[in-house]
Regions:
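Anion-binding and metal-coordination hotspots
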Residues: 1-211
Length: 211
């Protein structure tokens, strides 16, 4: 959307929005012959891969983080299991939990997306959570076969994603970023409403993309 005009549209076989953003931007740029300097999108499009692509393409992301709304709730802010609510010590690259125990780096793992993008996850572990009074609040996952009394706290963190999300959050909460998000909501949702109501469209049924 640009000034209430639909400048580009696409259909995708992918069930989620996350994986559709990069192909959409590439396709739009190749057909229009130019690229927008700012990419404004809702939370469904947030991912580490999308952040890195937009930055590498010389553009600026204004994407609403997936945890943006829930992060403002009291429940989220009081959830001691979340790393966001723990103390982080950059000099030691470690987290301090509610009970004052230190979670240090034990290993890193690399994973690859369907498109070939590689993400690095850093694992932080507490050496011993025995006798911790906050254990059931802090360690989640009832399907784990290891008994609770034998389990220790583990955090899995993508440092790149955390950094890009923090940078993006600063942008979208600025006066300019807030204006862009409001404008996106008005234009995109308004146009969608026009198509449904004024043109009386309810559902699109296609067999493949060829037709």
């Amino acid at each position: 959307m640009d000034s209430e005009y639909i400048t580009w549209i696409d259909i995708s076989l992918r069930p989620t929005d996350t994986c559709t953003l990069i192909p959409f931007l590439k396709d739009m740029e190749s057909h229009l012959g130019f690229k927008y300097s700012e990419i404004v999108a809702d939370a469904g499009y947030e991912s580490e891969e999308n952040y890195l692509f937009i930055e590498g393409n010389g553009q600026t992301a204004y994407i609403k983080p997936q945890n943006y709304e829930i992060s403002k709730t009291r429940k989220y802010k009081k959830d001691i299991s979340r790393r966001e609510n723990m103390e982080y010590h950059a000099d030691r690259d470690s987290y301090i939990c509610r009970n004052g125990r230190e979670l240090t780096v034990t290993n890193e793992r690399r994973s690859k997306t369907a498109s070939g993008s590689v993400s690095v996850k850093t694992y932080y572990r507490s050496p011993d959570c025995t006798g911790c009074p906050y254990k059931t609040e802090c360690i989640k996952g009832n399907n784990c076969k290891t008994p609770m009394e034998k389990r220790n706290k583990v955090l899995m963190v993508s440092k790149t994603m955390s950094q890009k999300r923090a940078e993006d959050l600063e942008r979208i909460t600025s006066e300019y970023g807030t204006m862009l998000r409001m404008n996106r909501s008005i234009q995109a949702e308004g146009s969608f409403a026009d198509v449904k109501e004024d043109m009386n469209f309810r559902r699109y049924l296609y067999r493949g993309k060829a037709n």
